[in-house]
């Protein structure tokens, strides 16, 4: 077996999508990316450094391109150990709310969970149209409709309410 990306198990995303936004859970995909091959009018290979990874960001977000493939830096590991790490990651994600969402919406604030801040502001269940703050995890917005506008309006409302109640600007 190969080890290094087990933390991604259970995240509802394609490899290209998770690289595009430097996704992850506890760790980020950038920690195991060697290079990314893209098409932006021509085929190019970007090194990890050229991808300019940061929190929920990569170069691919700044340029119009398709991610063709990704080379990962993985290491050989006992398959049973890899399997256990995957099971642990899946178990940790078993509490993630079901439904159509983009995962966590806001960054944590100074080490405090954005979900806890939103919950403390009394916003679990807040709705705009068919988008609502999950009752299971307040940093998830579930969209049962087709309108992204509902989600954007709800995000704006959450930011305003959290700022009013706590003086915190969620990002």
Regions found by a protein language model. Give the residues of each.
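Phosphate/pyrophosphate- and phosphate-bearing ligand-binding catalytic cores of soluble enzymes
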Residues: 39-171
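N-terminal glycine-rich flavin-associated loop
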Residues: 1-2, 28-45
């Amino acid at each position: 077996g190969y080890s290094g990306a087990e933390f991604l198990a259970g995240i509802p995303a394609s490899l290209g999508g998770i690289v595009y936004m430097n996704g992850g859970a506890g760790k980020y995909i950038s920690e195991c990316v060697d290079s990314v091959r893209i098409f932006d009018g021509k085929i190019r290979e970007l090194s990890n450094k050229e991808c300019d990874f940061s929190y929920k960001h990569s170069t691919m977000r700044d340029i119009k391109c398709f991610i063709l493939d990704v080379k990962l830096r993985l290491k050989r590991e006992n398959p049973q150990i890899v399997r256990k790490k995957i099971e642990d990651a899946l178990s940790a994600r078993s509490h993630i709310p079901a439904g159509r969402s983009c995962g966590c919406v806001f960054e944590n604030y100074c080490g405090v969970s954005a979900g806890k801040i939103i919950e403390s502001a009394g916003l679990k269940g807040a709705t705009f149209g068919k988008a609502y703050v999950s009752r299971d995890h307040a940093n998830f917005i579930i969209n049962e409709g087709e309108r992204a506008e509902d989600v954007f309006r709800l995000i704006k409302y959450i930011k305003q309410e959290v700022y009013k109640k706590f003086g915190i600007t969620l990002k």
